[in-house]
Design a protein with these regions (language model features):
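Short glycine- and hydrophobic/aromatic-rich loop-to-beta-strand nucleating segment
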Residues: 141-143
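His/Asp/Glu-enriched short active-site or ligand-binding loop at hydrolase and phosphoryl-transfer sites
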Residues: 113-128
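Active-site regions of metal-assisted phosphoester/phosphodiester hydrolases
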Residues: 1-113, 147-165
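Short secondary-structure transition/capping segments
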Residues: 104, 129-131
């Protein structure tokens, strides 16, 4: 592996690329799961090639008529709960494509059994800040388990590199 601290690496079991993760083991055998995730959003224009459409086809071919975004959220929550149940700390870096202060994912991550907080929002305070160049809301976040201490955080301006978030 990459470091003696890295215990395991993996991806979303569906193969859809919804998230990837790395589990590290630090001092006192404390384990932390670091997850990088993308939650699809329904495109403004009908597109067979969008990530959302691809994921909906995947589920439909398996007999599930479901919203790709809702399914991703449900599966991600289940994955995080498995880690939390094992006593692991979790860091979730996500392009959530929904409001990170008041959306369904935010509400669920704040509940007692998961107990996570948005570290960016914590550092920025109550200021409203968009995280997508065409948006008005924070749709990206770095959620951390409540027992983790975040010392600092920063955000790059839009178009700092090739990204639009």
């Amino acid at each position: 592996y990459y470091s003696p601290y890295v215990e395991e690496i993996g991806t979303d079991k569906t193969g859809l690329g919804r998230w990837s993760w790395i589990r590290i083991k630090g001092n006192n055998n404390l384990k932390t799961m670091i997850i990088s995730a993308y939650m699809p959003c329904k495109p403004r224009k009908q597109s067979m090639l969008s990530n959302y459409a691809q994921q909906e086809r995947y589920w439909r071919m398996r007999g599930e008529e479901t919203c790709a975004k809702n399914k991703c959220r449900e599966d991600l929550i289940k994955f995080i709960l498995e880690s939390r149940t094992k006593g692991e700390r979790v860091i979730l870096m996500i392009d959530g494509n929904e409001k990170m202060r008041t959306g369904a994912l935010a509400k669920r991550l704040k509940q007692r059994d998961i107990n996570m907080r948005d570290s960016i929002c914590e550092k920025v305070g109550s200021k409203k800040f968009p995280t997508w160049f065409r948006g008005q809301e924070q749709i990206d976040a770095i959620w951390v388990s409540d027992e983790l201490n975040v010392e600092s955080a920063t955000m790059f301006p839009f178009f700092f590199s090739i990204r639009d978030h």
